[in-house]
């Protein structure tokens, strides 16, 4: 222990207002520190994690059902090894339980363990090719989105005012909490890249500033994946309206983060412009859609695939696949059929198999 200096009064820690600091822009962030990290880990493995596999896709449930360990891993208050080993211990404990006691735990922890492996995989991508934080992984996309991004579109997306309720709710929740589940992170980035046709760098920087779990090795490969510029990953152009109906069917999440839509009936909450009284809300309390989402998605798809169809595209994609592709997936070069992954993939998964399995 450190002895107090005699003759000095400790006093009180000044508040942010007394220090003339700006108001906290992220009031709902997780508490940090080693103790909080251990509580979070134990709570997930012992109580919260059972519905993980099925609940992680929806922001309605993901804030509780996901591990919420990512900030602790990013800041070092928990180590990857201890999280992996604690997961394996819990998996061994399940073997002694009856099927009714196991419930959904086995599938949940298998899925979670897989994501720990993927975390290391993506970090290795950036370590291997650091330029992908700044440059398109596949050079054929260098001329895809040129010039400065449309400022009005970028700022509407940043503020959560695109006029697409589910997208805006996710952005506002992220800004207030510093966290969002993976699927919705992907949707936010895909909407910026495809629907708003923004170069991935500026939206990627904005999200990086918001995430309390920002990890460059995970963030930038994912940003490029969701923007379609890797050349080897599936093009996923999320329908922002369908995602709302799928992940928040009753509009509970949207209403929490977009209180200006309180008067909109449930059946119109994801498409308020279809409500007969839309004029009382749109462009007053809440903006009209910034663009026709179906039209801009179609245009984006055509632009992306026109580049992929070029004869010279495949050679570069094969180089990228050979360097960065997951060997465990068994994915062949882009022009060939896939084959099953070999059984012995221990080295390729960083040797992190649970002991005894």
Predicted features, each with a name:
Residues 1-140, 252-357:
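Glycine/tryptophan-enriched, flexible segments
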Residues 68-266:
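Active-site-proximal binding-pocket segments
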């Amino acid at each position: 222990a450190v002895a107090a200096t005699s003759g000095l009064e400790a006093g009180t820690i000044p508040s942010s207002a007394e220090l003339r600091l700006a108001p906290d822009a992220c009031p709902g962030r997780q508490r940090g520190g080693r103790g909080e990290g251990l509580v979070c880990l134990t709570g997930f493995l012992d109580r919260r994690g059972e519905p993980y596999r099925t609940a992680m896709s929806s922001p309605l449930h993901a804030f509780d059902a996901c591990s919420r360990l990512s900030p602790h891993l990013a800041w070092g208050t928990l180590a990857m090894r201890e999280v992996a080993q604690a997961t394996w211990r819990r998996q061994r404990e399940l073997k002694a339980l009856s099927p009714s006691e196991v419930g959904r735990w086995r599938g949940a922890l298998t899925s979670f363990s897989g994501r720990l492996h993927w975390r290391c995989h993506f970090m290795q991508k950036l370590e291997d090719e650091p330029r992908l934080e700044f440059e398109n992984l596949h050079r054929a996309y260098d001329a895809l989105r040129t010039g400065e991004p449309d400022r009005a579109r970028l700022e509407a997306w940043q503020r959560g005012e695109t006029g697409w309720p589910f997208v805006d709710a996710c952005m506002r929740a992220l800004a207030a909490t510093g966290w969002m589940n993976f699927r919705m992170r992907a949707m936010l980035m895909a909407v910026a890249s495809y629907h708003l046709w923004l170069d991935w760098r500026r939206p990627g920087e904005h999200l990086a500033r918001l995430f309390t779990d920002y990890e460059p090795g995970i963030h930038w490969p994912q940003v490029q994946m969701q923007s379609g510029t890797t050349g080897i990953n599936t093009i996923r152009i999320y329908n922002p309206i369908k995602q709302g109906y799928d992940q928040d069917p009753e509009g509970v999440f949207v209403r929490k983060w977009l209180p200006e839509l309180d008067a909109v009936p449930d059946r119109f909450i994801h498409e308020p412009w279809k409500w007969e009284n839309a004029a009382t809300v749109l462009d007053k309390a809440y903006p009209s859609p910034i663009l026709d989402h179906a039209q801009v998605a179609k245009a984006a798809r055509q632009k992306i695939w026109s580049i992929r169809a070029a004869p010279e595209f495949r050679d570069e994609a094969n180089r990228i696949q050979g360097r960065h592709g997951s060997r465990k997936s068994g994915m062949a070069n882009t022009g060939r059929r896939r084959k099953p992954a070999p059984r012995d993939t221990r080295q390729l998964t960083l040797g992190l198999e649970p002991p005894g399995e």
